[in-house]
Amino acid sequence: MFAVRVGLQKFNIAHKFEIASIITLYANWIREGKLKVNSDWNKERQIKFTVQDPCQLVRKTFGDPMAEDLRYVTKAVVGEENFIDMTPNRSNNYCCGGGGGFLQNGMPEARRAFGKLKADQIKATGATYCITPCHNCHAQIHDLSEHYEGGWHNVHLWTLICLSMGILGENEREYLGDDLKEMDVLFNREEDVST
């Protein structure tokens, strides 16, 4: 989105469309009652979540309103009491160290060293899961957890939306920990599909 937005501005390209993130759409749909999520599944479990504010999405493109939408959706699906924010956060959040091509550049030691600050930041929250709405952040933060033995799982926002709606499919459980991987939700069993 950042490249499209900057490209349109830089080359003064006329357009009749609005650039929006799926996160803002999720937030709007939840506010309007079109996306019916809830956090009941996590009331007793009390699994803690934090979020990564992607540089390209928050700081460089949409700013803190995007970060607020991300938190709104997260709290709606995991419960406000189960959300732990990183410090610093929003537009001031630390870079994960995997963006700008660094993830694919073949220098994992340097990438991990740069990402150590992010790993320590996530660890400090005590959260079991880090929600990563950016592909590069997702891959980097997953690697950081394994490399630095962080103990957290990282997960896509969509996975938690599906879980909160009771429609989490078998193929959407790859990044979940054992605490959620086997969670029994609608359409998880054959008898659910037939009813």
Feature-to-residue mapping (PLM):
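Iron-sulfur cluster-binding electron-transfer modules in prokaryotic oxidoreductases
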Residues: M1-T195
